Amino acid sequence: VLSPDDKKHVKAAWGKVGEHAGEYGAEALERMFLSFPTTKTYFPHFNLSHGSDQVKGHGKKVADALTLAVGHVDDMPHALSKLSDLHAHKLRVDPVNFKLLSHCLLVTLAAHLPAEFTPAVHASLDKFLASVSTVLTSKYR
């Protein structure tokens, strides 16, 4: 459960991401594909090379979903319901992949926002991404 301080940290950090959200989303995906090559199996039709339009496009989708989650942090299950359905029933993404992408997002944010990425912000973002992952996997049961 996110505390009031966690929510404050997440909103402030995501506010700093701002217009770079899509770029950071794509970078996190590239990190995931390089660090965890088995994740590529969910994107057989993508050009996964550095800077590809498909990776950039999906990175923007990831960032947009996180922006939605930040904006509805008190009601993420409702806000992310359609996305949860998509990943559980159509795409059938193994839930472990959300943890891998979350890790890569944290690394990306730490690299781009070193001054803002304090231990408290890191912990809050980690809890937030874990909450998003829980919501996205809630319909797998």
Swiss-Prot record:
Residues annotated with N6-succinyllysine modification: K7, K11, K16, K40
Cellular component GO terms, alphabetical: blood microparticle; haptoglobin-hemoglobin complex; hemoglobin complex
InterPro entries in the record: Globin (IPR000971), Globin-like_sf (IPR009050), Globin/Proto (IPR012292), Hemoglobin_a-typ (IPR002338), Hemoglobin_oxygen_transport (IPR050056), Hemoglobin_pi (IPR002339)
Superkingdom: Eukaryota
Pfam assignment, any one: Globin
Residues noted as binding O2 in the record, renumbered to the chain: H58
UniProt keyword annotations, A-Z: Acetylation, Heme, Iron, Metal-binding, Oxygen transport, Phosphoprotein, Transport
Positions of the Globin domain: 1-141
UniProt modified residues of type Phosphotyrosine: Y24
Molecular-function GO term, any one: peroxidase activity
Residues found modified as N6-acetyllysine: K16
Tissue expression remark: Red blood cells.
UniProt keyword Metal-binding present: yes
CDD domains (UniProt xref): Hb-alpha-like (cd08927)
Residues the record lists as Phosphothreonine modifications: T108, T134, T137
GO process terms (BP): hydrogen peroxide catabolic process
Keyword Acetylation attached: yes
Its job: Involved in oxygen transport from the lung to the various peripheral tissues.
Family per similarity comment: Belongs to the globin family.
Protein name: Hemoglobin subunit alpha
Name of the gene encoding the protein in the UniProt record: HBA
